Amino acid sequence: MEEINYKKVKAWPFVEALKIKNKISKVKSKNLIIFETGYGPSGNPHIGTFAEVLRTNMVRNCFKEISNIPTNLIAFSDDLDALRKVPEDYPFPEKLSEFIDSPLSSIPDFTRQYKSYADRNNNLLKDFLNRFDFDYKFISSTETYKSGRFDSHLLKILEN
């Protein structure tokens, strides 16, 4: 089988993967490349959510074709974001409307199946991604802040 010259491939995922490969060629340590997609769990995951994860994963897969560097895909939930409006498809709009401007992870889940409104939507996202066999790691901003994982970075920001 003839070897593909990926530098000549014009498909945008390969173009983006090559940009990443070229950029990291200047970095000494190349143990792992992380591809990340963000999700705002203010409502149910939808086709736009799927498209963002799919596009990121397409670039990741192309990167794996042109590189031997291991990769991870992270689905990062911005579940500390505030609720700006009540989604039209939510079953308890009158209850949810009382929590406008509240962090998504501090809003109760009115279906009583999850720890919070954000946890409900995060689980819907994970079910959605699992249905399509995405290889990813899920990270919640609420849990990341609570764990202290961001503390040293936040302190650096405050010092500058």
What residue spans do the PLM features occupy?
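N-terminal accessory alpha/beta regions
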Residues: 44, 53-55, 74-123
